Curated annotation (Swiss-Prot):
Biased composition (Polar residues): 193-210
Biological process per Gene Ontology, one example term: mitotic G2/M transition checkpoint
Record's keyword annotation contains Lipid metabolism: no
Catalytic activity, reaction form: S-ubiquitinyl-[E2 ubiquitin-conjugating enzyme]-L-cysteine + [acceptor protein]-L-lysine = [E2 ubiquitin-conjugating enzyme]-L-cysteine + N(6)-ubiquitinyl-[acceptor protein]-L-lysine
GO molecular function: nucleotide binding; ubiquitin-protein transferase activity; zinc ion binding
The protein's name in its UniProt record: E3 ubiquitin-protein ligase CHFR
Ranges annotated as PBZ-type zinc finger: 606-628
Pfam name, any one: zf-C3HC4_2
Native organism taxonomy: Eukaryota, Metazoa, Chordata, Craniata, Vertebrata
Length: 637
């Protein structure tokens, strides 16, 4: 801040629902607000405030004041939201919400902007000088020896109140309490440096920027033990705080005094944000990454989340695997070596270790896919042993299923399937497939046991292994472990798929469990033709199951012909291939409905040139105007 900028104040921000003396005087031509520590008005402990939330700019020529939003959540001015990269002309009396929560008013951070005329600014400076002079006289009587000033940073507020913002010392002034009260509190806390805290610029002989600093003391009448606890917490968050109290005569670099220091602080903040867990909002500890999205969290934090949801906390992508992120763990360790004050306490570390429910078995690689068109090879599951010594038994199979000797259930359960849900699903579907394998906890004998080094398949739905028994069926293409069309393996027919939400990933075509929405957009996304078919079925008390059975009967009689001649009513199809074949049969069924059984509005439409291949039939107007249950008649190769 130059001397020219500091000649007079042009505005001030008064905090809503605060003490009458709590105000922020704006002097610089540009004032920044955000969570970063180098902002003029900083809220470092409030995660609802963006790093660079907004900036308030004063035009010295026109005298106008503008607020430009740079945040993610936006800024609310007079109950009107200003989003990112938008500007708003501030008027005297405008209420600015840096944080606005309609259902959580205690989280709101609101200030009232008040413009200051040059006359008011001059009188304000005279009043400040009077306060400083009175403070100098009082401190001279009690402490004649000059002491270097010490900055006392604000202590965090207790309860649910908003954290008091820390401000840039070169642009903003706080008047939170009478100076006499500040002197009493400082003398009680630290008698050596009490006079320097409240004395202001009378004892400082430095640059003009230093001369205009007004040190502020903060207190809320709490007991000594509570104040000391909060001070220790502040020491961990800010390395400069502890050093300022330990040595009152140490030189304290002012923020903004050197451009290099400001750049280094911004870089440090960026690194800290990159190494912060979004769940606990602290530096990562024993971090893990979820796949396939690769977002990273503390192991203890994600353990609690994993019990409630199977989706990623950041992007809501389904989590398939969990892995240790060794690179980020090393980066966090290196960062803490340079910033030891940011380390967690021993109690926090012990608590996080106790809450960590991610076992070593969950971190082992579960699936390694290997697709080959030349070989009829399957997917392989690698079960890595905890013992890395040379005496480990290399003759063990790379994967284990329920029918392998030595199978243990807890080593094979999918990461996103709860143990109780899996047990319930296995018990319910124990007799669905040809295998009579039961839960590993029961003593019932099993008909099939995997031989050593047996080949296994990985279910496409639940990603769990099962024995490869395709060649026990002749021909192997009709195996109940594969879809006839896509040839992908599924375990539902074999022993029941345990994935939550699976209603039959593989079944005979006649027994396929399609839901009631299978008729929506059944004709290449043509909603109008789909509604015509649904109305026709509902008027006759029929559902999609009746349509499927009638179509399969016509297929068996040779009335219908599918593009894949291999498909019959007894063919094993996965859900996707079965739905695609069902839509093909639905078109055949709709095509054979007599026009006399359909409304006149349907039968009186002309045929579209493109017929069933029309790409415009998804538009409602075009679908209503033309009939698309016909073959293409123009531009046909």
């Amino acid at each position: 801040m130059t001397n020219q900028d500091s000649d007079q104040a042009w505005g001030k921000l008064v905090k809503v629902d605060a003490s009458p003396g709590s105000e922020i005087v704006l002097i610089n031509s540009e004032c920044t607000v955000g969570r970063k520590k180098d902002c003029d008005l900083s809220f470092p402990a409030n995660k609802l405030v963006s790093g660079n939330h907004c900036k308030i700019t004063h035009d010295q020529n026109s005298g106008k004041v503008w607020l430009e939003d740079m945040s993610t959540n936006g800024t609310v001015i007079n109950m009107s939201k200003v989003v990112k990269k938008q500007t708003h002309l501030l008027q005297n009396g405008d209420v600015i919400y840096f944080v606005y929560r309609k259902n959580e008013p205690e989280q709101n951070i609101a200030y009232v902007y008040q413009s200051i005329t040059p006359q008011e600014s001059a009188s304000h400076d005279v009043e400040d000088a009077g306060r400083e002079e009175d403070s100098d006289l009082t401190e001279t009587e009690s402490e004649p020896a000059p002491v270097e000033p010490v900055i006392v940073k604000p202590l965090p507020q207790s309860g649910h109140e908003d954290p008091q913002p820390s401000t840039s010392s070169s642009s903003l002034h706080f008047y939170n309490m009478p100076l006499s009260t500040c002197s009493d509190v400082s003398a009680r806390k630290n008698p050596v440096s009490s006079s320097a805290v409240c004395k202001g610029d009378s004892t400082s002989s430095g640059s003009p920027a230093q001369t205009r600093l007004k040190w502020t003391c903060w207190t809320d009448g709490e007991p000594e033990e509570e104040m000391q606890r909060k001070r220790r917490k502040t020491d961990r968050d800010d390395p400069g705080f502890g050093s300022a109290h330990s040595d009152a005569s140490a030189d304290i670099p002012l923020r903004g005094a050197s451009g290099k220091e400001k750049t280094e602080g911004a870089t440090t903040d960026k690194m800290e944000e990159s190494l912060t867990c979004i769940i606990c909002q602290d530096l990562l500890y024993d971090c893990i990454s979820v796949q396939p999205c690769m977002h990273t969290f503390c192991a203890a934090c994600y353990s609690g989340w994993m019990e409630r949801s199977s989706f990623c906390p950041t992007c809501r992508c389904p989590v398939e695997r969990i892995r240790k992120n060794h690179i980020l763990n090393n980066l966090v360790e290196a960062y803490l070596l340079q910033h030891p004050e940011k380390c967690r306490t021993e109690d926090d570390l012990r608590s996080m270790d106790a809450r960590n429910k991610i076992t070593q078995d969950m971190l082992q690689p579960k699936v390694e896919r290997s697709f080959s068109d030349e070989e009829a090879s399957s997917d392989y599951l690698f079960e890595l042993s905890d013992n890395d010594s040379d005496i480990s038994d290399m003759s063990q199979p790379y994967m284990m299923c329920r029918q392998c000797p030595g199978y243990r259930k807890e080593l094979s359960s999918a990461l996103w399937i709860c143990e109780s849900a899996q047990s319930e699903s296995l018990a319910k579907t124990a007799g669905d497939g040809p295998s009579t394998s039961s839960d590993s906890t029961t003593a019932a004998p099993q008909e099939f046991r995997c031989p050593p080094q047996a080949s296994h398949l990985i279910c496409t739905c639940c990603l769990q292994p099962m024995p490869d028994r395709r060649f026990e069926h002749l021909p192997p293409q009709v195996s109940p472990q594969h879809c006839l069309v896509c040839q992908k393996p599924f375990c539902h027919v074999y022993w029941g798929c345990p994935r939550i939400g699976c209603h039959g990933c593989l079944a005979r075509f006649s027994e396929l469990n399609l839901n009631d929405k299978c008729l929506d957009g059944v004709f290449n996304g043509n909603q109008y033709e789909s509604e015509v078919l649904q109305n026709y079925l509902s008027c006759r008390g029929m559902s999609w199951r009746h349509l499927l059975q009638d179509s399969l009967q016509a297929l068996q009689q040779g009335l219908y012909h599918l593009s894949d001649y291999r498909i019959t009513a007894n063919s094993f199809l996965c859900y996707c291939c079965g739905l695609r074949t069902f839509r093909e049969l639905a078109y055949k069924y709709r095509e054979r409905i007599p026009p006399s059984e359909l409304p006149d509005a349907v039968t009186n439409r002309p045929n579209c040139y493109w017929g069933r291949n029309c790409r415009t039939q998804v538009k409602a107007h075009h679908a209503l105007k033309f009939n698309h249950i016909c073959e293409q008649t123009r531009f046909k190769n």
